[in-house]
Amino acid sequence: REGIERANRIVMNDLPDGIRTIRITENRLNLPQVTTETEVSSLKRHLEGEPLGHETQLAQKRVEPMVPKTTEQGWYIDKSRFDFHIDPVLNQSVGGPENFYMYQLGVMGTADWWVTDHLLTTGSLFANLANNYDKFNYTNPPQDSHLPRVRTHVRDYVQNDVYVNNLQANYFQSLGNGFYGQVYGGYLETMYGGAGAEVLYRPLDSNWAFGVDANYVKQRDWRSAQDMMKFTDYSVKTGHLTAYWNPSFAQDVLVKASVGQYLAGDKGGTLEIAKRFDSGVVVGGYATITNASPDEYGEGDFTKGVYVSVPLDLFSSGPTRSRAAIGWTPLTRDGGQQLGRKFGLYDMTSDRSVNFR
């Protein structure tokens, strides 16, 4: 909202006579989120200052995103279609039976290229600096388990010094009336490649939303960095129906519940609860229970974890939406594992939240 205030001030400095309303439409990854309408006369009074005791409320409202008509005058922010950045990466797991603290430290180089306003191609190359996953000795599932090893080959993947983490194409589209969609395909994460789609319904300034995603993926080979561009024989259909809820009595809390099929073919649900603080820091936890029995799952019985997400603008001199996430997963096992998609529509449409600030 500070961005809206700054934009309004800039527009007012060069505003032609006779303009009654300023409309500012926010976009994220070229998806229109929301249009903020501000009455010029009201804004002018606020900028000039009002007499003490005679202050009025700024005449401003949020509406569904609008595209300027041909008869309207407008401006837009011109951004480069190509972007490249390098980021530090720390993956970690706490409390495992093999070693209490396991980590992987590296750097990730990412290149993004917008082919069109809706089609994004993106790829990331990971360089491994240090890790202690040689102590991850989980090589055989429980004898009575029928779960395929969808995550416990992690040691084999991270022993490669440099590898393509993801290389994919995403097509994003605003479908109107609060609906958003995306389709994607390629190497979607370290361990899986394939194709999928997601649709989200998120009414403006609502405290709830619903989404569904469906994917067909194959497991990437782990024997070498070159082999990671190939696939094993294992493939699976995975997807979830997800509900998002910000309780009216605790609007800084997000409750996320999903049901569907996981990477090992097991079916069940995940409950995630996260708390956002005034600083922007988010602390959350999750648990997943599926039809895989505790004996099939192995030590730990079910998948669970906690995480902390920190906005990087706390440490930056300029505004940024980037965040750093630190997660703790007590055990890495094969049951209840979701596909690690790079883009999720709910996070991409945060400007539509009733709590957006």
Predicted regions and their residues:
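Transmembrane beta-barrel architecture of outer-membrane proteins
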Residues: 104-106, 164-166, 192-194, 236-240, ...
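Outer-membrane beta-barrel initiation region
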Residues: 1-173, 230-232, 236
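Outer-membrane beta-barrel translocator/channel fold
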Residues: 130-160, 212-248, 258-266, 274, ...
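Residues on the lipid-exposed face of transmembrane beta-strands in outer-membrane beta-barrel proteins
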Residues: 107-113, 169-173, 197-201, 241-245, ...
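Phosphate-interacting basic helix/loop segments used at nucleotide- and nucleic-acid interfaces
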Residues: 179-182, 190-193
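Repeated loop/turn-to-beta-strand initiation elements of outer-membrane beta-barrel proteins
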Residues: 117-122, 176-181, 206-211, 248-256, ...
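Transmembrane beta-barrel strands of outer-membrane/channel proteins
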Residues: 86-92, 123-127, 183-187, 197, ...
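Outer-membrane beta-barrel biogenesis signature
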Residues: 51-82, 317-356
